[in-house]
């Protein structure tokens, strides 16, 4: 799987919210029979967050349970998972931790889609394009960079 594709696990739900494609995938990550749901959303081509390192330096851009744990840094698909310390990993409702349902993950992923859409404005796109061009110009003018003429 390349870093910018949708996951290859079992698709549980797909929808579009405010123009953002969203999906919930499930997989038995621990081979214990419990298929844990995780949420994913697609960043539009010109979205300013598409080129950020969402799992590193720019991890605070989106507020989602556990942070962005899939994609980022040029990826078209970003996602989050339900495998954190305060989550129920067993699938047993009698065990401690939050046991996420597909409906719960859909709600949290829809909240992520709202954040993506809120950042996808004409102003933010124009600023991103201007910043990209400034970086390109700086690279062209940098005397320490080798040119291939």
Question: Across the structure, where does each feature detected by a protein language model lie?
Answer:
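Generic secondary-structure transition motif, activating predominantly at the C-termini of alpha-helices
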Residues: 113, 117-120, 135, 142-145
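Acidic (Asp/Glu-rich) sequence patches and key acidic residues
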Residues: 33-48
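Short intrinsically disordered terminal tails
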Residues: 1-2, 139-149
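Structured loops at beta-to-helix junctions and adjacent beta-edge loops in soluble globular domains
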Residues: 25-27, 42-44, 81-83
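Polybasic, proline/glycine-rich intrinsically disordered low-complexity segments
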Residues: 2, 8-23, 50-126
């Amino acid at each position: 799987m390349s870093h910018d594709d949708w996951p290859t696990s079992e698709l549980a739900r797909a929808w579009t919210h405010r123009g953002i494609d969203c999906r919930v995938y499930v997989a038995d990550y621990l081979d214990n029979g419990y298929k844990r749901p995780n949420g994913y959303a697609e960043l539009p081509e010109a979205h300013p967050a598409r080129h950020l390192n969402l799992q590193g330096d720019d991890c605070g851009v989106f507020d989602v349970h556990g942070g962005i744990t899939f994609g980022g840094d040029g990826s078209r698909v970003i996602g989050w998972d339900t495998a954190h310390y305060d989550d129920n990993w067993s699938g047993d409702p009698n065990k401690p931790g939050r046991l996420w349902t597909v409906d719960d993950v859909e709600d949290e992923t829809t909240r992520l889609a709202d954040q993506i859409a809120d950042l996808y404005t004409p102003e933010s796109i124009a600023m991103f394009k201007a910043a990209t061009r400034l970086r390109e110009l700086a690279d062209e003018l940098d005397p320490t960079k080798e040119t291939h003429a």
